[in-house]
Amino acid sequence: MNRRELFAALAATAVVGDALAMAQPTTVMGSHVFDWNSLTDVPNQHGSTRTVCSTPTATLENLEIHVSTLKPGVSPHPPHRHPNEELIIIRQGTVETLSNGTWIRVGPGSIIFNGSNQLHGFKNVGTENAIYHVVNVKTEKTPAGGTVFG
């Protein structure tokens, strides 16, 4: 095979690869029920996490939901920011959350919204495990980038 034939073969492979990639539909989650008993509780150094889903929907590039259990006196990570917006619903325990530069203490039933690229943090300041539901959303308007600590 000479250089011209090699180049033509590589170009054809690239075109076919692109066409196949574009033809692969992204599975979009429709209405769904998640049975609590079917969610695996995975222990970690801070407590545990149950992953509910991380998938595209009809209107979101990604919907990520998990439920975390956080041991008393523990923070899952240092204050940080990320492009996606995040909603946290406290089910059990007392936590402090960093919001708009201020640490605020909240308990069961409280709802925390962390805006895109806004510095936020979280720690369990109670004497029992804190359990909370986290909903992260990514849309076409979500800025590019990843998590930045500090």
Positions of PLM-derived features:
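Short, conserved beta-strand element in jelly-roll/cupin
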Residues: 69-70, 81-97
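Short acidic-glycine-tyrosine-enriched beta hairpin
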Residues: 102-116
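Aromatic/pi-system hotspot detector in well-structured domains
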Residues: 63-66, 82, 111, 132
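Ligand-binding loop in jelly-roll beta-barrel domains
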Residues: 60, 116-141
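A short, N-terminal "cap"/entry segment at the start of jelly-roll beta-barrel domains
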Residues: 3, 7-62, 143-150
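Conserved short histidine dyad/triad with adjacent acidic residue
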Residues: 51, 66-81
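Histidine-centered metal-chelating micro-motifs
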Residues: 75-77, 96, 112, 116-122
